[in-house]
Amino acid sequence: MTKLRIAVQGCCHGQLNQIYKEVSRIHAKTPIDLLIILGDFQSIRDGQDFKSIAIPPKYQRLGDFISYYNNEIEAPVPTIFIGGNHESMRHLMLLPHGGYVAKNIFYMGYSNVIWFKGIRIGSLSGIWKEWDFNKQRPDWNDLENNNWKANIRNLYHVRISDIAPLFMIKHRIDIMLSHDWPNGVVYHGDTKHLLKLKPFFEQDIKEGKLGSPVTWQLLRDLRPQWWLSAHLHVRFMASIKHNKRSHEPPNKSTSKTKKNNNEIDLDLSSDEDERSGIMNCQEENEYDSKYGETRFLALDKCLPRRRWLEILEIEPDTSHASWKDENHRMFWDPEFINNLVICQKNKNLLSNKPFNSVNWIELSQSNREEGRDIDWENYAIPAYTLDIQKDEVRQTKAFISKFMT
């Protein structure tokens, strides 16, 4: 049985060299098809980017990324990553729909769905904060003039425009990525062990506040095979069984959270050994069905004696164009692209209507040509060209021109 080997990394915090050293060690023994990094990537290109990243001045350092950005080092395996809450937003805001940040390294944008070698991967960058969910992000040019500092702790908060196209997805997702945890997963794993490692989570767990309520709703709706997260700097596994289509939150209090202007980075060490593991996925259902069980995995950040990297082995759809592609290209997802276009046309409705009252299935059917033949060549993500990562605006304009106009 054919399976893809996918390396999964928790928070990066600029430690690309260490991550790729471990990936290369494993890759030399048994090849790895793809590396996924689950946020706090910190794509800092120069000193100017520090004005847009939530890192105290005494901890600011360029990190390893600049060597990849300047083509001094090449990533050893294809890499995709999502944004977290410690990102160079001055950089990533130029790529709202994703794009190359270096050779072999692709940012997924605020949200996305792509295909790679027969695996369908969805993503959502940032973290949940209720008070910013219905707000628009400021314009990059306005921020560049004088406002980065004033907005440094809200630019990475998830917006309704980020997540709406994901709620409209009708066909199954193999792997879903988010930086913070869906807030219901904690009740489906070994909570006692989690509290041994992170006792200060107890109150949030009791109140149903450890994580994002909106991604928990999305998990119950999409029912992916895997949901992967980071953010809380601890390894945690859970298994969520899906008996019925459900949008219900976990059976805990979901009262509104008071705004905290002093968000801190959780950073308590655990006594667990740093090691890699392999997990085998179960045999799949047919393409259009959703999975009866979602396996959740959260990983730590890249530090000694932490569990920050693991290998998943996943069975691909060998009938899909992305599997058959001889150049092993990534492909944008037609359903997600269609949803983006619909959301753009209905942005006034989405901004004025309560989120939980939107009929996502009905909305997704507007202007949809069900059963149409797909020209997958039209959705192939262009191959990397030298220094394209340094022309972020051109990458974004090309995407908008191709799909959004």
Swiss-Prot record:
Binding, a divalent metal cation 1: C11, H13, H233
Modified residues (Phosphoserine): S269
GO molecular function, one term: RNA lariat debranching enzyme activity
Keyword entries, A-Z: Cytoplasm, Hydrolase, Iron, Manganese, Metal-binding, mRNA processing, Nucleus, Phosphoprotein, RNA-binding, Zinc
Bias (Acidic residues) ranges: 264-274
Regulation: Active in presence of diverse metals including Fe(2+), Zn(2+) and Mn(2+). Binds two metal cations in two adjacent alpha and beta metal-binding pockets. The activity is the highest with Fe(2+) bound to the 2 metal-binding sites. Activity is low with Zn(2+) and Mn(2+).
Residues holding a divalent metal cation 2: D40, N85, H179, H231
Main location: nucleus
Subcellular locations according to the entry: Nucleus; Cytoplasm
Annotated region described as Lariat recognition loop, given as residue ranges: 125-159
Co-factor(s): Fe(2+); Zn(2+); Mn(2+)
GO-annotated cellular components: cytoplasm; nucleus
GO biological process: mRNA splicing, via spliceosome; pseudohyphal growth; retrotransposition; RNA catabolic process; RNA splicing, via transesterification reactions; sno(s)RNA metabolic process
Role this protein plays: Cleaves the 2'-5' phosphodiester linkage at the branch point of lariat intron pre-mRNAs after splicing and converts them into linear molecules that are subsequently degraded, thereby facilitating ribonucleotide turnover. It also participates in Ty1 retrovirus-like transposition via an RNA lariat intermediate in cDNA synthesis.
UniProt similarity note: Belongs to the lariat debranching enzyme family.
Miscellaneous comment: Present with 1130 molecules/cell in log phase SD medium.
Protein name per UniProt: Lariat debranching enzyme
Recorded name of the encoding gene: DBR1
